[in-house]
Amino acid sequence: MIIELDNTHKQDLSSLRSLSAEIISEFCKIALEFIKKGSNKKLYMGASQKLNIAADKIESLVDSITYLFSECTRFMLNENDFNDTLAPIKLSDEVIEILRESYFDNRKDIRNTLQEFYPHLDHYQNLEWRLDTQIANRSLGSSINPIYLLKLITKCGSDNPIEHLLQTDPNNLKHLCNELESALNEIRTYENRLIIRNIK
């Protein structure tokens, strides 16, 4: 899989051609700090004075490197895909090597940092059910609909399981089962399996 970079990111990354290996490594470190701790204007100002480059240009370049690293980490790109992503920019082998090394050395940390921003949703653990129906009633001549009582148990991370008590009638339960079956069939398609494989 290849990450499609927009024109702004391509322009910023192409400006790495004119910089030395030491400065590119420094930009990679600043980008990694940006991912972990957020933006630091003082760093940009210091780098601006040291390199004689406008602070907003430095910030834009760091943003582009940050985007490259975070997107590559999100899709867990391998070495070939990483190289193919940068191929349209026509960077030298040395520049690509510095970026690649910085990315692969820190990929696990970047992934852990990015996961903190994702919502922590409950996951299914167990489901128990019981069918309740009234056998007889003198006041009602018509038949009585049975009721399903469901106990859904979910868990979020290492927290204790949470019990959810639900009640439904057979028609709604059948509709729910049909919708879940449809969702399971949808997730088995080639496109969705490809997306899921890249998310993991």
From Swiss-Prot:
Domain COMM: 123-191
InterPro entries cross-referenced by the UniProt entry: COMM, Commd2
One Pfam family linked to the record: COMM_domain
Disulfide bonds: none
Subunit comment: Component of the commander complex consisting of the CCC subcomplex and the retriever subcomplex. Component of the CCC subcomplex.
Role according to the record: Scaffold protein in the commander complex that is essential for endosomal recycling of transmembrane cargos; the commander complex is composed of the CCC subcomplex and the retriever subcomplex.
Name by which UniProt lists this protein: COMM domain-containing protein 2
